[in-house]
Amino acid sequence: MSDPLILIPARLAATRLPDKPLAEICGEPMIVHVWRRAIESGLGPVVVCTDTPAIVAAVEAVGGLGVLTRPDHPSGSDRLAEALAIIDPEGRHDVVVNVQGDLPTIDPAVIAASVTPLADRAVDIATLCAVITRPEERTEPSVVKVVGSPVSPTRLRALYFTRATAPWGEGPLHHHIGLYAYRRRALERFVALGPSPLEQREKLEQLRALEAGMRIDATIVDDVPLGVDTPHDLDRARAVMAARRLN
């Protein structure tokens, strides 16, 4: 596996938290915190891809790299594919890691762990999950579950992703974490496919890959990182970052 490239897609179009990537956390925009966590993972170069010049400016102000993409992409994966073609037309990077732009407190080690399943050449896409520990999350549709077959104590081969409570019976349920590491050829194939029936029904983009016969494996990590989607989440992220700076 050659030098991975980390891409962080970001947009200002969030409805519950307007201008989310530029929200201030401990004196810096949230997107800058995510960029720093990605740099700290040590995986490889990090680029923010966005349709908003203000986001590029915020990242470049701290020495980072941002690239402007078209505003009309139907999905984040399409934005990644365009950014990849702009940044690396020669194809030097054969692994692309997609880190969501609303994870300012994510542990860099978790980002690094995302690529581990790609050491297995049978795996097309790698992702992350964590065991669900809160009973209410087992039935919450916004908590996406990975239904998977164990490959090792810390890795599942994903057979399905669902908003339902699954699998049935005794045993753990796994909360999917939407961070992906793609083989470049898998990303290119993925965006060339049209939306699939199960993807449209569950509203889960990753089902497109499974329906097309691609293999997705998930590394099991200890915790689900805090995603910032609401003003309450933003307050929590500010408190976490402030506590880290005091320690």
From Swiss-Prot:
Chief location of this protein within or outside the cell: cytoplasm
Signal peptide range: none
A GO term for molecular function: 3-deoxy-manno-octulosonate cytidylyltransferase activity
Superkingdom, natural source: Bacteria
Regions that span the bilayer: none
GO biological-process terms attached to the record: CMP-keto-3-deoxy-D-manno-octulosonic acid biosynthetic process; lipopolysaccharide biosynthetic process
EC number(s) per entry: 2.7.7.38
GO CC entries: cytosol
Keywords linked to the UniProt accession: Cytoplasm, Lipopolysaccharide biosynthesis, Nucleotidyltransferase, Transferase
Catalytic function, reaction form: 3-deoxy-alpha-D-manno-oct-2-ulosonate + CTP = CMP-3-deoxy-beta-D-manno-octulosonate + diphosphate
EC class: transferase
One Pfam family named in its UniProt record: CTP_transf_3
Subcellular location: Cytoplasm
Pathway terms, separated by semicolons: Nucleotide-sugar biosynthesis; CMP-3-deoxy-D-manno-octulosonate biosynthesis; CMP-3-deoxy-D-manno-octulosonate from 3-deoxy-D-manno-octulosonate and CTP: step 1/1; Bacterial outer membrane biogenesis; lipopolysaccharide biosynthesis
Chain's role: Activates KDO (a required 8-carbon sugar) for incorporation into bacterial lipopolysaccharide in Gram-negative bacteria.
Protein family (similarity comment): Belongs to the KdsB family.
Descriptive protein name: 3-deoxy-manno-octulosonate cytidylyltransferase
Organism: Methylobacterium sp. (strain 4-46)
Gene that this polypeptide is encoded by: kdsB
